[in-house]
Each structure stands twice: as structure tokens, then as C-alpha cells.
């Protein structure tokens, strides 16, 4: 392997370039270019155009950024759907218009025009010419890992348009941008998406990797891509790609970290990513998905091609591709036995089919999963280098994963499917993994349990996959042998790549395991460092923490999950999810995120293999989507992916379960089966690190959350019920202690992915991830395994957002097998939740605002409660996903079952809660479509106990879990019912959580937020769908929001559902906020009016969040513009005192999944405020206190500009009375507004002594909210 991974950096860089064009076909290569002719604005300049949406505008986010006043912020869009198709030019409602020169034609906004080669275009006054570049069709042959192309959603491709601009140039700098760019390119040919060889992948241009990778890396393991989104995208890449690319350390702690095999440039990014990924062991899956996003040039390209949706732009594509991929499930097996327990992350191509294999592999300690973990390790080891490499690896892995997932989806045979998909992924990963022979790296990280593998060389990327193999477990990987082979020898790995199909056949699970494994394992190892209790894992966690400061934070989170084994996993997931959330827009790739990481911890304490399942890829997508969302709110293509996502749910599976059982679960294509052995003291500390990262995403998450809340609320009740039923029945069936933990992990993982993401966001927002993590640590002490689960869960959660639904479905399907590892996992989650309080408030408020969000998020939140720190962040994104996806994915029952079971488990209750939560979040989402009482019971039970324990004490978490699982189940139901009425507080009381209510609420908020945010990225797509459907309505009713939120909370309280717990916490501590925000948001159901800007992306965000577009100022509740301008609408808004907000408010709200509080997004225009000597904030404040012209009667003469009707509108909005005719009597405060031309008309008024004022009395007076007629009297000279 090492030989294979040996990378000649110089050569690789060239290779990278080659690969970007060749391997990916079109991923990195520009499809065309815009040549702007020289003129007064400057010299001639060329802008490359990539697949997807290329936005032309003044905004620096635009692909074609023209920083000139005549160009609108988003002037026009050139969408390239495929390399061989003519680009579509659309004007975005620009101020100065877009014209075709020959024949002369002005493009009306929204009208499409097919560009011909050499066609001349006029953007405002900037002439340019479109040139088509001869780009060879995507090389499908190169992608042994070609994924069955999932329906690529053009919307996604569009989503990436804004990001695209950054992609090529800002790839490194702007992960999200890069992601998008890659994505857009990828979108062009989903089927063409090829997983470049690891070296080549590594070689891919670094820029490609950093941007997208980084954003997606943030997401949790499940949402590897998602995790990668923010900045952890890199990390995710590191996980996925990193796992593949970084030199794998043979099995550190049974988890080998694959160093990114990516080329130098990528390596640099990968390293960075690795750091992030390191913390996001889970992110491996994400990496795979997000990997393209991560944009390792070669990897990313390959990945991108592989998973166009995976990329921010291609989010859609990746997600679509991921949809098939979603079948891939990652089971994160976290060995509870030892901190360094060789948790192996398995990327299961087909959660359903391969799960069994994966589980078996897990049972065997599947080395490949650990290898996957290795990828994570890579992350933490070398911050910069690893990150870069990780990004690359992540990209490669993501691609591979997507492909393998796609294959899994397409393949009918569960085991075979997984193998099949895996081989592709493996190939990609193998390329990465073998290239990275990071086994050593992984071992390095693994040995410490930290798995902070420093991906020394980009070649490590290839090895990443290989690395997955745990040191102790390598032998255990018979199925993984192929993967082992891949990882064992570079040649083998490459061979595996080439023979990926063979590998797949051998053991799709195995391959899957390997692919996802790196991420998870890495996370575990890396995260371990964070936690003191589990040295190896702590080390890993530490690495994660390192990463956490930057995108690594997310990665770290991902990593953490692995490191904590239980706690760390959560944390990692959180960070990843956070990332995903951040990448909210890009998070659109819900489908891709389907890939989930299943945390599997053996009760025996044997290293379990975390297996990344289909959810993870979705996570990556989510991440990407999120990024896209962040970069481009317009990337609404998420919705389609959401749909895909629903298909890609994770199944929760108990480790005790037989491989057969797993398989059956796996049969549900996108289901993740988390198997968590109880491992003491997962490094919860790692969670805090993710928290910090998470804090970055909180607002976005918050914004996304409201929707999640509503939707979740909606789904929450049914799901809760399901959970109760399914979970409870399952509970008895399985050994409470043993099985609960496993399912918990699963559910937890899945939900965590959802919740964690959300949590991440929240935590990011709160900057409290660290706290979360700490509580997690406590939980870890109590329920180490739960912690681990949590961590892993978060990873799944990251994927969960889309996968949340998926998970729900999966769980629904797998309801019968709720062993409820969830209970363990959930237990951990509550702890996390606890830690996450700080994060929670912000997130919570955001999240609560949207009932939909509350419902969906709550379930997710529940997960976070258990895994607040890690889970929550993941939960957020995941939740968002689930939320959006929830409408279409009614298969939450499965999660329900497991959730319930977790409650049974005493120690694992926390975890079960987590799982439950995750499940519930998903279930909730799904609930809308398919309410099943099963979930509710169990969920409520485990959640409450877990949540309470977590809340009151992370340590007690285990015990509360036991206690409250059943009561909570009913309680949750009850709460949901009552909570809906507004007893969010009530949930607080019932839960021991009440004490940590604040933290937990925060956590819950975080989760909700995260879910929302994840939703926004992931949820963005799903949310668009789900939120639009469910959320919108729910969001509309503040009461309902509260109620729904309560239900979510109720759901969250259920012990079975950690997610719910966080939601509950949110409702408890943050409930008021949530409630407050939601009611405002909902009550107001914002009616948004735009002035001076035409922003279809913003309009879509409004609609997706449940608001409406106002036709006039009179019915508007919010005015959106880009600067202070004295337009009639603007002045009317000032006169009425309605918030005048920047476009960023909509973008961030979209990411957060709900309308964020407007106060932070008031338009800022220091120049204009200085010119007119006023403060907009003060003016609005005065206008709200008292109308400026309340006592005034004003007549406006005909010659005044603006014309009298518009002046009359301004006067009315300021409380004045308009006199239709010239007044004939004097009265105080009766004035005439006129101009010099109309002075003759004013003779009577002048004789009466009525003040004759210039229009500035209104225009300036309204702006400053000062009525000073004497200052604007027309002088006698003028008269």
C-alpha cells in the first residue's frame, strides 16, 4: 500500500491537474470562459465557467465577480448542466439588465438564453464574450468507483453556481466556494463522476480540495461531507479522502488513519482537513461525499465527478448520486472496550444489504472500518497538511463513497451491493488508502487512540481507505480483506480500486467499512486525545480540538466521535455537522448525506467498527449543500436531494444483532446500523472542541432550525409514538444493556448526524461545543459508550439531516431491530447536550422559531441531548436534513424502535436516547409522512432518562436513562402533546434535564438549529422540500411552533431519543427563546419585500422558510436590500419601523432553517449614514416608538419628485395625513411639499402662512426620523 501511496509531490501536482480534467472529466476543468473586454473598468480579463451555476455579480461570492457599481450583487447566472450542453444565461433581476448583443435582446429576469460559442453579452455596461472550451467528456472509465448516477438535481448544480466562482480561485480559501465549484463541475456528469486513483486524486489541484473539502469536512461523520462543509470539509476530506489519502497508520486503536494520498497542494489542504477530519473520524463518510466538495483537486475532481451532488454546486448531483449511495451506510463501531478501542468505521454502500456484512466486519473488528477511521486520524495529525490532504482524501473518499453508495443502492444484494458500491468507493479510497498507506498514520493516531495521523504525504489520501483497518482488528477483516488488501499494499489498494467491483463483490460491507471507517476511526483516534479518560481517543480528540479551531473543529468533532468512541464520536459528528450546517446551503445534498456513520460499540468493549453508511455521503452533501447555502442561498436544489435522502436512511442496529440482522437492516438501503459497545468514558471532552467549531455555524443552524422544528414537531408526535412502540418492543427483545447501546449508537449516530449537525451549528453559535464535549465526557464517564455513540452518532447525524429522514425510515424499517444501541448512544448524547447549553440558546431560539424545525430538530435534538456536544452539532445539520427530508421520508419508525430500546438500557440509556433522538429526529421528519407510534414510546422513555441524566449530570445520564426511558416515553408523548400546547417548559421539568436545562436547551437549540442549519445546507434541500411543505405551515403558527417545538421537545425528552432531549433542553432552557423566536417568526410569517435588489436566491429562501413575498410596503414585515437607499419602499419601511435587512439575513436564515432575529442583520451602510448624518438603527427605533408625521397634514404638488402618489405612500407610512388638494386654511402641522416649478400653484398656501417645503423634508426627514419643517422651507429666492 505504501508503495502505491508513495507520492511524488511534483508529479502529483501535475497529476492533480491532469486528474482534475481527466479523472473527473469536467470536475475541475472549466467548461467555458467569459472574456471581459478591456475598458474604463480595467484590462481584458477572463473568467472560467464551470459545470453548474456560475453567478455573475458584484458579490465576491460570485463565480464571475465584477466589483463595479453598475453590476448587481447577483447580476446573472450562467448555468452549465453538462460539458456538452450549451450554457443557459439568466438575468437575476439585475438593476441594469443583461443583454445579448447579436441579435440585440434584453434578457428579462428569469428568461433563459442558450449561449452560443463566441456570443457577445452585455452585463450592464460590461461587454464580454462567451467562449466554449474543449473539455473532454468526463472519463467514466477512470472512475472505477463510478457511482450509479443518482438523479442529479440540476438545482444542486445551480446551487453551486455562486460557490463556483470561488471554486476555481477560492477553492483553498473558501471551502464552501470550492465545494460548490467542484460540485457544479461534478454535476455536469454524475455518471461520469469517477474516483480518480488515489495518487491522482491526491494530485488533483489542491484548490479543488480545500474549498469544498473544508466546508464539508465540518460535517459530522455521517455528514462527512456535511462536516466538511464549513471548514471541516477539509477534515471530512481528510476523513474520507484523508482516510484514503493520508498515510494510513495501520490500525491505531484498531482504527487506522489513512493519510491523504492527495498531492502536495491537496495535501496541504488535506492536512488541514485531516486536522478537521481527524476530529471528525466520522466525517470519513462525509469526506467521501464531501470529498468532492472538499475539492481535493484530483480527489475532489474525481469525487466531484463521482458525486456531483457531493460538491457544493454539485451538491445536487452528489446528493443525487449519493441517493444511491445513501444505501451506503457507515456503521461506526466504536470499541467501548478501550479508549483506543479499535472502532472501525465501515462505509456501507448499501446500508440495507451490506449492513450485515459491515456489522459482521464490525464484529470481526473489521479492519477496513478502522482504516476508514484512519482517515480521520490523518486529519488531526497534521493540521494544515492533513487538512489539505484530508480535503483531497475526503473528496476522493466522498466520491468513492458516493459511488459505492450509488452502487450499493443500485445493487440489489445487500451484501453484494455494499461490496459493489464499496469497491468503487474503495477504489477511490483504495487509491487514497493505498496511496496513503496511512495505515501507519492511522496507527500513529490509532496507537494513541488518538489516531491523530499526520498525513505526511498527499499520497496518504489513497491510503486513507486502507488505514481504516484497525491494528488489532486487521485480521478480523476477512470481508474487509479486499479493503485490507487495498490498505495492506498500495498495489493491492490500487488493485482494489481497479477491481473495486471485485472488492465490492467480496465485501461491499467490507469496503464500505473501510471507506467510512477511516473517518470514524480517525475521529475516534483523533478525538481520543481530546478526552483524558480515553488516552488514544483523547489524543484523537485533541487532534480534533486542534482542528476545531479551524475547519478542523468540525473534523475534530468527527474525529472525536471515534476518539471518544462514544463521546468523541458525538463530538466529531457535532463538528462535522457543524460544518455541514455552515455549509448549510451546500448542505443541500441531503441525499448524499444519506450515508450515515453507524457507531457500533461492542458491549464487550471490543473495538467496534464505525461504519459509515449512505447517510454519511449525504452528510458530505449536506455539508456541501450547506456550504452552497452559505455561499449561495440560491442553491435550493437541496430539495430534490432531500427526497433522495429520505431513501437513504440509516438503520439503527445493535451490535448484539447478528450480521444477518444488520443485513436485514441494511436491506433498507439507506439505513445506518449503529452498533455501539459500551465503552467507558468516551472522550466527551472532544465534544467541546467541536462545540467551538459548531459555534461558527450556530446562526446558520439557528436559521435553519425553525423549519426543522416545525417539521419535526409535526413528525415528532407520530415518530414519538413510533419510537415508543417500536423502541419499547425492541427494547425487551434485546438485552437492554447490550443491545441498547448498539442500536443507540446507530440511532444515535443517525439522529446524531442530524442532531449533531444542528448541535454543531448551535454549538458553533454558542461557542459552547467544548462545554458540550465536557458534559459528554461526563457522560462518557457514565456511559463511555454512549459518549462514543454520541460522537459517532453525530457523524451519522451530520448525514442525518437528509439521513435523519433516512434514518427514520431506516429505523422504521429496522424498527424490529431496535437493539437500541441508541440507548447508549443517546445517553452520551444527553451529556453532550448538557455541555452544549451555551450553544443552545442561540441555536435554540432560532430553532424553536420554526415549529417544523422543532419537531424534526427536537428529535434530532434528542440525539444531541445525549450527544449534545457532538451529536448536537451533527444533529443540527442532520436534523435539518431530516426535517426537510422528513416530509418525504416517513420511515422514522425504525429509529423509533431503536430509540425506545435505548431507554431500556440503563447505562446506555443516554446513548439510546441519542440514537433514539437521532432516529426520532429522523423519525420526526419522517413522522409527517409516516407517523408511527412505535418511536414515541421508547423515544420518550430513553430520552427523558438520558436527557435527565445528561442534563442533571452527564454521569447520571446512564441512570436517568434507565429510570426515565419508559416514563419519559410516555412523558415524551405527553410532553409532545402538551409541549405542543406550549409546555416546552414542561419537558424541562420532567427531565432531570431541567437542571442542565439551560445547557441542554442550548443543546437542543443547537440541534434544532443544527438540524435546521444542516437542513439549510442539507436541510436546505430537504428543508426546502419539507420545510416548505411542513415547516412553512408550522412556522406560520407561532403557537404551533411552540406546540410543535414542544412536541419535539417532548420527543426529545423521550429517553429513546437523544435528539428530542436536546430539543427538549432547547425548549426548556431555550424554549422561551425558541418559542419567542418562533412565534415572532411564525406569527409574523415574515412577508418580505425587496428594494433595489432582485435576488431570486433570497426569494427562494423566504419561501423555503415559510415566509411570503410582499407586494407592497403596507403588507411587508421585513424589507431586504443591500444598502441604504432613498427609494419609496425604503423610506416607507423606515417610516413604519419595520426591519430593513441585508440579503445575508435571508441566506443565514436559510442555512439555519428559520428566520433569524433581524436585529443582527440590519443593513449597514456607513457611507450613506455618514452622508445623511443618521443611524438607521436609531431611526427604526424611533419610528417604532412614534410615527414621525402623526399630526401632520401634507399636500404634495404635482411636480414633486418622487411623484405625489409615492410621496403620499411615504406620508401614510409615517402616520401623516395626505391632503389631496391644496389646503385653504391654516393649521398647525399642515404643510405643502412642492418644488420651484409648482410654486405658482402655492400662492394660496403661501398667503395662509402654510410652510412650503422641499421634498427633502420627507426624503431626509423620514430617513433621519426627524420632522424639522423649518430646515426645508423653500426660500423666497426660490419662490
Swiss-Prot record:
Spans annotated as Interaction with the MRN complex: 2-222
The record's account of how the chain is modified after translation: Phosphorylated upon exposure to ionizing radiation (IR), ultraviolet radiation (UV), and hydroxyurea (HU). Phosphorylation in response to IR requires ATM, NBN, and possibly CHEK2. Also phosphorylated during the G2/M phase of the cell cycle and during activation of the mitotic spindle checkpoint. Phosphorylation at Thr-4 by ATM stabilizes and enhances homodimerization via the FHA domain. Phosphorylated at Ser-168 and Ser-198 by CK2 in response to DNA damage during mitosis, promoting interaction with TOPBP1. Sumoylation at Lys-1034 by PIAS4 following DNA damage promotes ubiquitin-mediated degradation.
UniProt-listed InterPro entries: BRCT_dom, BRCT_dom_sf, DDR_Transcriptional_Reg, FHA_dom, SMAD_FHA_dom_sf
Coiled coil: none
UniProt-annotated location(s): Nucleus; Chromosome
Modified positions (Phosphoserine) in chain numbering: 168, 176, 198, 220, 298, 314, 350, 354, 372, 380, 394, 411, 421, 434, 438, 457, 488-489, 550, 587, 589, 730, 745, 793, 801, 824, 1008-1009, 1012, 1016
Modification Phosphothreonine, positions: 4, 146, 222, 300, 316, 356, 382, 440, 466, 889, 951, 1054
Domain of life according to the entry: Eukaryota
GO molecular function: chromatin-protein adaptor activity; histone reader activity
Residue ranges, compositional bias (Low complexity): 278-292, 798-817, 994-1014
Cellular component, GO annotation: chromosome; nucleus; site of double-strand break
Protein name in UniProt: Mediator of DNA damage checkpoint protein 1
Organism: Rattus norvegicus
Gene from which the chain derives: Mdc1
